[in-house]
């Protein structure tokens, strides 16, 4: 399955369809329709959160899905598919790719990322695994563990990379990521315009994930209203 999945997303746009509990569009049904609209617009893949949303989306579309499970724990800052339990739950949906936090930060219950990856590969040998990284150190770490894809998802969202943007300094961080691994790199995080999506692919990324700029109406509206307020 791996090679065919990779071919399907190569050079394309993956749309992240997520709405958390405190957001107006929080609904598996709504996310399934959001995903359908994204695919009709040309998306080659969908990134989705929770098994419930994923299953609803699977009933509407047939492109590859990057599945995650956002869950907060008191003893760790890691929240994207943080423990073996969440990784297993997402794998059980049958998604083609499962993404998880691959930073060097302490995980909930002191679980070890290497142990999680080794265990889950034995259970789901045909599933691809994507590393959501923040720093270059994370990239090296994820690469050494054998992740199938490296994502820049958490750049700007960890304590170490706070307030940074992937487009800063002419995409300098992304360029460093591309130099640091031979694995396919998925650009993700604060890619908020079509031109940025095109640029990251031109730089050599395997695919690009865009979320809020497409699927979060409140964020899109705020960008317009903030600009109008400058009058």
Swiss-Prot record:
Keywords: Carbohydrate metabolism, Isomerase. Belongs to the NanE family. The keyword tRNA processing does not apply. Pathway: Amino-sugar metabolism; N-acetylneuraminate degradation; D-fructose 6-phosphate from N-acetylneuraminate: step 3/5. It holds the Pfam family NanE. It comes from Listeria monocytogenes serotype 4b (strain F2365). The keyword Nucleus does not apply. Converts N-acetylmannosamine-6-phosphate (ManNAc-6-P) to N-acetylglucosamine-6-phosphate (GlcNAc-6-P). Its EC number is 5.1.3.9. One of its GO terms (biological process) is carbohydrate metabolic process. It comes from the Bacteria. The lineage of its organism: Bacteria, Bacillati, Bacillota, Bacilli, Bacillales. This is Putative N-acetylmannosamine-6-phosphate 2-epimerase. GO terms for molecular function: N-acylglucosamine-6-phosphate 2-epimerase activity. InterPro entries: Aldolase_TIM (IPR013785), NanE (IPR007260), RibuloseP-bd_barrel (IPR011060). SUPFAM superfamilies: Ribulose-phoshate binding barrel. It catalyses: an N-acyl-D-glucosamine 6-phosphate = an N-acyl-D-mannosamine 6-phosphate. GO terms for cellular component: cytosol.
